[in-house]
Amino acid sequence: MSERKLFTSESVSEGHPDKIADQISDAILDAILAEDPDAHVAAETAVYTGSVHVFGEISTTAYVDINRVVRDTIAEIGYTKGEYGFSAESVGVHPSLVEQSPDIAQGVNEALETRQDASQDPLDLIGAGDQGLMFGFAVDETPELMPLPISLSHKLVRRLAELRKSGEIAYLRPDAKSQVTVEYDEDNQPVRVDTVVISTQHDPEVSQEQIRQDVIERVIKEIIPAHYLDDQTNYFINPTGRFVIGGPQGDSGLTGRKIIVDTYGGYSRHGGGAFSGKDATKVDRSASYAARYIAKNIVAAGLAKKAEVQLAYAIGVAHPVSVRIDTFGTSTVAESKLEAAVRHIFDLRPAGIIQMLDLKRPIYKQTAAYGHMGRTDIDLPWEKLDKVEALKTAVL
């Protein structure tokens, strides 16, 4: 019998406590960038019953009404009723934002290449906002070149939110989680969905039988292609039996606690840095986007079926200290050729990434729920496939 393997990824809805925090942090970032594209922002958020704390470091000429941004974000998510234990108008908002450390700022505003080597290249001016390593990934399992388990997991919780916000399923509340287990064949191709887990917050009067029927028929079967489902697929719908208390009333939330949900669902390695609330001088964010951009174009060019790109930086230095590409034995050319082509085509200095992907714009709040990578519902610059021909030519 051929060997088959299972892989599982999860996602969470926009109403999950950690995702509320991410969205608030990115809403603040967007509000600042709309007035001051050169701002340096590191905005962290903590949420719990009846309270939001916003803290971190910001250098900007902009004035932003933090209180209003927080409340508008919470209302947009759907926390508008007192019985949720967390509502837009009654929540306490406690901002505590300070100026960015001058020790960090001197390395970001004037990179080592400019200070030490007197470089005149304007793209050498910005140094990395911190040391670190970042990964980007792509695989040919889905049209958006993402792993199937995380792709399906995101789409399931997005569908729940659509049904809730449209009023089609009126008993749904904002907090929800999904988890999808996919079975792979001996060639590492996805063949079926083995297990689907969905937990969704709900009003107290609805029966679990009704929730199960609605979730299977109106969420799972509308999102997961029928050829992946069979009579052996397991469905766990609200397996605790009740999920009325949710959101920040049920659990506290913090910015940056869903980094695997934000990326590839554990299918690829992760450098550990979170995204939300950070401007593009923070390579945790911008270099992760650049690495995804590279990996996606490599796979789209047919140069590999699967590609993982690692970038690494030193704080205050513009050029990356390393670039590595791993195609897991699927490349059609030597990986050394791919690395040389990537270094030639993509400017991986922070200022180069910012320019290449136009990252000084207020585009970040929309990424703070349902994944930063592989999005088909919004237009993100790191998802473009405009380097395919350049890569094909460069490896000849």
UniProtKB/Swiss-Prot annotation:
Reactions performed catalytically: L-methionine + ATP + H2O = S-adenosyl-L-methionine + phosphate + diphosphate
CDD domains per record: S-AdoMet_synt (cd18079)
Its EC number(s): 2.5.1.6
A Pfam entry, by short name: S-AdoMet_synt_C
Chief place where the protein resides: cytoplasm
InterPro entries listed in its UniProt record: ADOMET_SYNTHASE_CS, S-AdoMet_synt_C, S-AdoMet_synt_central, S-AdoMet_synt_N, S-AdoMet_synthetase, S-AdoMet_synthetase_sfam
A biological-process GO annotation: one-carbon metabolic process
Record region (Flexible loop): 100-110
Binding locations of ATP: H16, D175, A176, K177, R242, F243, D251, R257, K258, A274, K278
Residues bound to K(+): E44
Pathway: Amino-acid biosynthesis; S-adenosyl-L-methionine biosynthesis; S-adenosyl-L-methionine from L-methionine: step 1/1
Cofactor annotation remark: Binds 2 divalent ions per subunit. Binds 1 potassium ion per subunit.
Binding site for Mg(2+): D18
Alphabetically ordered keywords of this record: ATP-binding, Cytoplasm, Magnesium, Metal-binding, Nucleotide-binding, One-carbon metabolism, Potassium, Transferase
Entry's localization field: Cytoplasm
GO molecular function: ATP binding; magnesium ion binding; methionine adenosyltransferase activity
Family recorded in the similarity comment: Belongs to the AdoMet synthase family.
Role noted for this protein: Catalyzes the formation of S-adenosylmethionine (AdoMet) from methionine and ATP. The overall synthetic reaction is composed of two sequential steps, AdoMet formation and the subsequent tripolyphosphate hydrolysis which occurs prior to release of AdoMet from the enzyme.
Quaternary structure and interacting proteins, as annotated: Homotetramer; dimer of dimers.
Protein name: S-adenosylmethionine synthase
Organism of provenance: Streptococcus suis (strain 05ZYH33)
Gene: metK
